[in-house]
Amino acid sequence: MIGAILCDNCKNNIIDNRYSGCIACGKPAARYGLCRRCRAPFARAWCVGERANVLKALINQYKFERARAAKHAIVDLLDAVLPPLPDGVTIVPVPTIPPHIRQRGYDHMALVARGFARRRQLSYRAAIQRASNTIQHGTTRATRLRQAKQAFECGDVPPGIYLLVDDVYTTGATVRYAADVLLRAGATEVWIAVVSRQPFSRTANV
């Protein structure tokens, strides 16, 4: 990996070692990314890999070092890991808070979600908006869960399947409440695709 460019060897290594456990608890998962015991407002989940090593560096460069070109590598990884999706699926980014958009100069997950939608020739819709500017990076699990409940709002959406795209799954609070607001707004079903899963030993305060 040089700068924000992911070489083929690194890319293939991430894909070959893709995340295969339950996105919520890490135990062996059934077909769609959740074990039989875990319940979530999303029906299916996919994850590229654990947030470590090269994948962690790629995400950090994209989020914190303005390495906008890393978007292309992340779209490639999502495209490689996710199976074929039905034509009617709509791709929705988990929105970034406005202060971070101003700081970076772009909404990092909106770019990824739009790029993935274009790659798969699927519809893209920025259906969810941030209702608050709370920053979750570095907060405790309890704080994340409390903040996430008031984090999002969404206008009415047509019935259908919506795929939420986010960068990191830590406690799951963000995508759970984002999925909740989509369902309340009219979505028939919500699926999620995340670039990385925070290692379980570090989920409390990251």
Predicted regions located by residue number:
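Glycine-rich phosphate/pyrophosphate-handling loop used in enzymes and phosphotransfer proteins
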Residues: 1-206
